[in-house]
């Protein structure tokens, strides 16, 4: 595997007067004329070689920081205001300050602030493309003079957890550890069913069905911000027939449904509409461009549906590659059961060194969250401490199976 890259001179990270990090901007050649920007984060002092970490994104049009929100300029002070969530920036900064070389890269077709630079490249990206991109990034990482190529870790978040396991299998002589944060065990089809059907139905049953009769008010559901975040525009989801309070059938008029007393059946109507909506996402319309900002790109989605589940892939990771799984118990995108399934599979195949750490109040971004929605903010420091501690553990490499529940109160 050979990847071309273009480098600039290392630059000190100008965030304070006393610098602890320097970095080098790179351009990675992904093949077929496609290039992407990357950044190598290094300790400010020393030439290495440093243990290396590659960060592999979750789904969607992610830049190298996995930015959740937009960078903007304060009109009064002129200072840069960063968005509340930049999980890969948090990881890169924390680890490089503590002696690691960390490589981040933008997804193909994507630039800073998850800007789509090339809609054709991004809209036609497949799961295999993204896996190959991670392989190219790994190739570039181990070529850097400051990197210890005998100590390489892959950190995947969400969709990235399905990629790092594959890259590890393909590069057994290079990869030493993999870390899975907010992990996939099942195929994205099952993950999508949880996000788009099971979770909204559970919310409707537990929160909106006040009379416990299996019916919810269209008006209340439409005005509920959590439910709207889960299902989108309820009027569009429902489409046609609905059931009123007295049991008669009415035609839902999208223009007026917010102001009437219409009720719908959670199981007989809402669930079927949510299933139909989920199926429609994977329909590929010839010539239609996809941004992936609101809905997933159909080409990417269908490529995922045909992929082998991570639960089957993980069992093939070589026994000398250590595995860490970090999981928030309030993850509303990849529920904690996914992490338990991976841990059970690793135990079944007798993988000698795997660890699962769960966090009671954290969501998919490892920030405090409810069980329904992902809170947006910086990764909690105790998660970063756990990650660094595991990577720095001198006794790893011996037979070690660990399941921990961690919280800020334990610190």
PLM features per residue range, with description:
Residues 12-48:
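N-terminal cap/lid segment of alpha/beta-hydrolase-fold proteins
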Residues 45-49, 53-94:
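Short, surface-exposed "cap/lid" segments of acyl-processing enzymes
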Residues 122-144:
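Alpha/beta-hydrolase active-site loop
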Residues 140-146, 150-197:
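Primarily recognizes the serine-hydrolase "nucleophile elbow" in alpha/beta-hydrolase
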Residues 181-316:
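Accessory cap/linker subdomain of secreted extracellular hydrolases
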Residues 325-327, 331:
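Short beta-strand/loop motif that positions the catalytic acidic residue
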Residues 332-338:
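Conserved alpha/beta-hydrolase "acid-adjacent" motif
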Residues 362-366, 371-407:
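Catalytic active-site module of serine/aspartate enzymes centered on a nucleophile-bearing elbow/loop
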